[in-house]
């Protein structure tokens, strides 16, 4: 039974356009290491510029509306882009983009222009700040607070196991805004510019590398305009964020490049003078 997916002529023409851009913009010597945490500063800066150029074409987040910096394209176009970037070991994103639909759904027009456009065009990157010491799988158990002070909110608390390769331009996440409120109706969801006075990032020392962080908030003051949704709708906004991941959208990728790299590795890499692929144990378990 044949399960091969066939692209249309229009989609293949788009593939040629993407290939031409990537081949011209990213020569083989610029292909990135497999582990994003291995990117040096120069390589990271290089690919940030590539992302900005892709964002200008609407290719960084191709299925989002053009009016906010997306491409207005289809999921098939996005898969073509993903495949071609994966074949060249080009990092797809440096942001946690799960917040993007939340801004589309819950954001005001001003918030979409201020926060969504720079993220979709690659001008800015962002961190998701959800987990706390008391709230991992139970997000509703968070303790960090946001207290209203005039038109602003003052945030205190901490987050941990926050994924990030470099410093972001924006953070997002829920905080307790109604201390005596009912569960799931006591949170507000904030978009926090970085750097800001009162925010400290600290790398965690873990066996799997430095890609996780502590984030501390000490009397951080944010504008009321940075509240996404109502002051007690943070749980609902967070659910919109996480729905993308629950549906698989947070892990969309093209497996072909990984498979090709694996096949090349077992064919070309030798152990005791014999290709890895010829090892009986490898052949038995493949």
Give the predicted meaning of each segment.
Residues 135-138, 153:
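Hydrophobic, small-residue-rich alpha-helical packing segments that form membrane-like cores
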Residues 151, 156-200:
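A short core secondary-structure module
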Residues 1-15:
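Intrinsic disorder at enzyme termini
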Residues 122-130, 173-174:
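A short, Trp-centered hydrophobic/proline-enriched beta-strand micro-motif
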Residues 144-147:
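A structural signal for short hydrophobic beta-strand segments in well-ordered beta-sheet cores
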